[in-house]
Curated annotation (Swiss-Prot):
<dbReference type="GO" id="GO:0045259">
    <property type="term" value="C:proton-transporting ATP synthase complex"/>
</dbReference>
<dbReference type="GO" id="GO:0046933">
    <property type="term" value="F:proton-transporting ATP synthase activity, rotational mechanism"/>
</dbReference>
<keyword id="KW-1003">Cell membrane</keyword>
<comment type="similarity">
    <text>Belongs to the ATPase gamma chain family.</text>
</comment>
<comment type="function">
    <text>Produces ATP from ADP in the presence of a proton gradient across the membrane. The gamma chain is believed to be important in regulating ATPase activity and the flow of protons through the CF(0) complex.</text>
</comment>
<keyword id="KW-0139">CF(1)</keyword>
<keyword id="KW-0406">Ion transport</keyword>
<dbReference type="GO" id="GO:0005524">
    <property type="term" value="F:ATP binding"/>
</dbReference>
<dbReference type="InterPro" id="IPR000131">
    <property type="entry name" value="ATP_synth_F1_gsu"/>
</dbReference>
<keyword id="KW-0066">ATP synthesis</keyword>
<dbReference type="GO" id="GO:0042777">
    <property type="term" value="P:proton motive force-driven plasma membrane ATP synthesis"/>
</dbReference>
<keyword id="KW-0375">Hydrogen ion transport</keyword>
<protein>
    <recommendedName>
        <fullName>ATP synthase gamma chain</fullName>
    </recommendedName>
</protein>
<keyword id="KW-0813">Transport</keyword>
<dbReference type="GO" id="GO:0005886">
    <property type="term" value="C:plasma membrane"/>
</dbReference>
<keyword id="KW-0472">Membrane</keyword>
<dbReference type="InterPro" id="IPR035968">
    <property type="entry name" value="ATP_synth_F1_ATPase_gsu"/>
</dbReference>
Length: 299
């Protein structure tokens, strides 16, 4: 009985220690998410504005630019997966990885070769464990993304897209990340980044509305050459920020659930320890009474 009581007390201490850790991680994530939410709110209007600008130029110029024109045959497609460097975030990483598997299966069914660009150690570990090849990987800044890394990713995407297919170039770019909706909801988002869908961000004009007349200096291709890299950089950076905010929200939610589970374990083991202690006391009293009866009988 005493050994069982010691086991329960050890488990209670262990649950208390675990609760301290999960509670601290919950508070850290809560403090970080405020900053990442502000960064998402600051970057999203610019990303939408640059998307509308590029879409408008491509739509109203009637010029076939390489980054906005659908190729006749798509042979290779890149999937850029945004994961985190650390775990303890519930289904945050598994959701984007599941979406990547679905998208890869769809692309392969269309006869396309799939190439992976990975962001975050969790995606890297997922592919390395399964011994699956990936082209590029970036790690280290997923909790607090910096624009320099977003620019590096965007440059790699553009370089692969503009490279000839015979030299290992790609014809299509897709990105998969968790979009921050609220503290309780983070949705996996699948977006085709290139070739750009020019309808995105441009509303259909009313039939009675006079269409805008654009003039481009020095010419349309030069304007698009300047705008599209900025567009890719802003979209990649916004996806990084959305992913970071979603990760902190998922971590806070997971750690809150872990703290609640620790509380429940403490309550359950405390009740079991009390029962064991009561049984031990009852047994001791019974032994004392039995011994006293034996002595009185002997006398």
């Amino acid at each position: 009985m005493g050994a069982q009581l010691r086991v329960y007390r050890q488990k209670i201490k262990s649950a208390h220690r675990t609760k301290k850790i999960t509670r601290a991680m919950e508070l850290i994530s809560a403090s970080r998410i405020q900053k990442e939410q502000a960064r998402v709110a600051a970057s999203s209007p610019y990303a939408r504005a640059i998307t509308r600008a590029v879409s408008a130029v491509a739509t109203y110029s009637n010029v076939g630019h390489v980054l906005t024109t659908e190729p006749e045959k798509i042979e290779r497609a890149v999937i850029v997966i945004f994961s985190s460097d650390r775990g303890l975030a519930g289904a945050f990483n598994s959701n984007v990885l599941k979406e990547s598997e679905k998208l890869a299966e769809l692309l392969r069914s269309q006869g396309k070769e799939v190439v992976y660009f990975l962001i975050g150690r969790k995606a890297q570990g997922y592919f390395s464990f399964r011994r699956r090849a990936f082209e590029r990987v970036w790690t280290g800044n997923t909790d607090a993304p910096e624009f320099e890394q977003a620019k590096e990713v965007a440059d790699a995407i553009l370089e692969s897209f503009l490279r000839d297919s015979a030299d290992g170039g790609v014809d299509e770019i897709h990105v998969i990340y968790n979009r921050f909706v609220s503290m309780l909801t983070q949705e996996p988002q699948v977006v085709r980044l290139l070739p750009m869908e020019v309808v995105e961000g441009v509303e259909e004009p009313d039939r009675t509305q006079v269409l805008p007349l654009y003039e481009f200096e020095p010419d349309v291709n030069t304007v698009l050459d300047s705008l599209l890299p900025v567009y890719i950089e802003s979209r990649i950076f916004n996806a990084m920020l959305q992913s970071a905010a979603s990760k902190h929200a998922a971590t806070q939610k997971a750690m809150k659930a872990a703290s609640d589970n620790a509380d429940k374990l403490i309550t359950d083991y405390t009740r079991l320890a009390n029962n064991a202690r009561q049984a031990e006391i009852t047994q001791q009293i019974s032994e004392i009474v039995g011994g006293a009866d034996a002595l009185s009988s002997a006398n």
